[in-house]
Amino acid sequence: MKMILLLRKTKNISSFNFINNFKKTKGFKKIGHCGTLDPLATGLLIVATDEDTKLIDYLDQKDKTYVARAKLGFETTTYDSEGEIINQSSNVKFTKEKLIEVLNSFIGLTKQMPPKYSAKKLNGIRAYDLARQNIDFELNEVEINITKIKLLSYNEDENYFDFEVVVSRGTYIRSLIYDIGIKLNSLAYMESLERTKIGNLFLEKNQDDKILNAKEIIQLEIIQLEKNQIENLSKGLLIDLKNEDNFYALFWKDEMIGFGQILNNVLKSKKLIGKKIQKILGDKQSE
């Protein structure tokens, strides 16, 4: 049964194990997700099931909103509370104005170094596997965009602060908090993290999951196709279609069937979901 859902991941479980538990509970044959959350983190995951898993690579394009807690005065191996403390700073007292000033300095396009304990790959090997073996290596910086950052609270007695941040795909909040600590001439690690929104998608407080329509989450222009056009595309044929040169999501009514590209007013399929097309064309033959 194909489906795209928004799920709320719980704490202390990997994203992979969380969605596989969901798959077994609901009886899906296949499941996939985008936008991995660390075991420590909670919050939203976009999940696709059965034949809709073929859409996964195209679902994780939106900015994400997080609420995080940063603990001041310490650095850990993993940049979060699950790591071993390796450095300490006594410079942990700041005014709210200073915190806001430093947070605001991160708004905009910037470069970020991913944490070594991450799923980034180096020569095909996960960075966290290399880090656990104490192998020395360097990751490449990535470009990120922070569109909003807001101080929510500051506990001066316990030396932590909470903030909300809206970031582009691929941003590591652990690394952001580490960088904030450095810019404060201190140290900091991530104590907790919740992903509260993906684009404009969110769950109400009493919701743990919600079924999504593909049109809500695909950040591409949409082309609505007729059955005869779908049949031609399934045969590898090109379709004359006047439109701007671009990459498009292909739909039959409310059903997303794949992706295509228009060049010089000619549409060529790039990825099609065979089972959906078989059903659509089967319905055509029965008409």
From Swiss-Prot:
InterPro entries xrefs: PsdUridine_synth_cat_dom_sf, PsdUridine_synth_N, tRNA_psdUridine_synth_TruB
GO biological process, one term: mRNA pseudouridine synthesis
Molecular function GO labels: RNA binding; tRNA pseudouridine(55) synthase activity
Recorded catalytic activity of this chain's protein: uridine(55) in tRNA = pseudouridine(55) in tRNA
EC number in record: 5.4.99.25
Disulfide pairings: none
UniProt entry keywords in alphabetical sequence: Isomerase, tRNA processing
Keyword Manganese listed: no
Active-site residue numbers: D38
Pfam family name, one: TruB_N
Family the entry assigns: Belongs to the pseudouridine synthase TruB family. Type 1 subfamily.
UniProt function note: Responsible for synthesis of pseudouridine from uracil-55 in the psi GC loop of transfer RNAs.
Annotated protein name in UniProt: tRNA pseudouridine synthase B
Protein's gene: truB
